[in-house]
């Protein structure tokens, strides 16, 4: 699969860094939200795009992108969504509800192992430093708090928090929690009442969505939305399984490709670091 036009981000690195600075100063710093996920779009054109090319990309993701919750290829009728999402949005099996908020992001070096197979000498040190970083810790706490509120709304006994855990991917390592509870609600109501995840919007969610509209120049399309499988288990009980649509290429039939990548901004965010994070997230699907 080759690109006829390699394209680039709709907001360049310098301008995105300025947006990050503005949000930290004018919004988060003034109490308009605890954190905000602001995205930018990488646009390119795939040469001779077809259903066969879509299947090729899907196969490569299955082979190369380890740790995904869902690896998928979905055709809407007018565009292809092909991706490897690390994050479960929500699942329901036998009345058991699960959500997996993911936030902290550690970028793996290109060479994670030495020639003899031992870990790269700086990897352990850098990973431990990442795990002790207060900015990364608070970033995850904020989204867990917001999604736990959702769990309390849909689960009659409230929710349980398990973790934190590491979520290793091919290019990144994330930190995540597992939220668990029981519900009597219809699975369709569960899906509706958990939209949209704080991990792709911010918190509080309603205010974050208002700020996203203000700071992102275009609508998000399918980015941050949810795919879902709904059905029944062998006992006839309703089931739901839904990932968040991130790390996904949105490709039109003529080959126009869009990959949206966002960074979670908090008071202590470093603009240059957030710029690099969007490159790493987009790179997982573009490589």
Language model: regions and residue ranges:
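Non-catalytic accessory segments adjacent to catalytic cores
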Residues: 1-48, 52, 94, 136-138, ...
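Contiguous alpha-helical scaffold segments within structured protein domains
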Residues: 1-8, 45, 106, 110, ...
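Active-site-proximal structural scaffolding
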Residues: 16, 51-54, 83, 90, ...
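Flexible, glycine/charged-enriched surface loops at secondary-structure junctions
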Residues: 33-35, 141-144, 219-223, 287
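Short coil/turn segments at secondary-structure boundaries
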Residues: 34-40, 70-76, 189-190, 205-207, ...
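An anion-binding catalytic pocket shared by soluble metabolic enzymes
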Residues: 37-137, 153, 230-261
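Conserved hydrophobic core element of enzyme catalytic domains
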Residues: 178-287
């Amino acid at each position: 699969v080759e690109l006829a036009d390699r394209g680039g981000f709709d907001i360049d690195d310098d301008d995105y860094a300025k947006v990050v600075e503005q949000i930290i100063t004018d919004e988060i710093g003034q109490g308009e939200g605890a954190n905000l996920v602001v995205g930018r779009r990488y646009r390119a054109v795939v040469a001779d795009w077809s259903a066969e090319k879509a299947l090729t990309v899907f196969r490569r993701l299955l082979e190369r992108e380890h740790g995904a919750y869902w690896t998928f290829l979905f055709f809407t009728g007018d565009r292809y969504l092909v991706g490897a999402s690390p994050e479960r949005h929500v699942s329901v099996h036998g009345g058991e509800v699960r959500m997996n908020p993911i936030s902290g992001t550690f970028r793996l070096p290109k060479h994670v192992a030495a020639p003899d197979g031992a870990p790269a000498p700086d990897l352990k040190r850098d990973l431990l430093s990442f795990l002790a970083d207060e900015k990364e810790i608070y970033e995850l706490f904020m989204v867990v708090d917001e999604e736990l509120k959702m769990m309390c709304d849909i689960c009659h006994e409230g929710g349980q928090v398990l973790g934190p855990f590491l979520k290793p991917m091919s290019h990144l390592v994330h930190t995540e929690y597992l939220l668990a509870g029981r519900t009597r609600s219809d699975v369709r109501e569960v899906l509706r009442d958990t939209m949209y995840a704080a991990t792709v919007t911010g918190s509080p969610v309603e205010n974050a969505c208002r700020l996203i509209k203000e700071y992102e120049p275009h609508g998000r399309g399918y980015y941050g939305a949810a795919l879902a499988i709904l059905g029944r288990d062998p006992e006839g009980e309703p089931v739901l399984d839904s990932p968040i649509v991130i790390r996904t290429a949105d490709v039109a039939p003529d080959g126009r490709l869009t990959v949206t990548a966002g960074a979670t901004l908090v008071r202590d965010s470093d603009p240059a670091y957030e710029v690099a994070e969007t490159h790493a997230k987009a790179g997982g699907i573009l490589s």
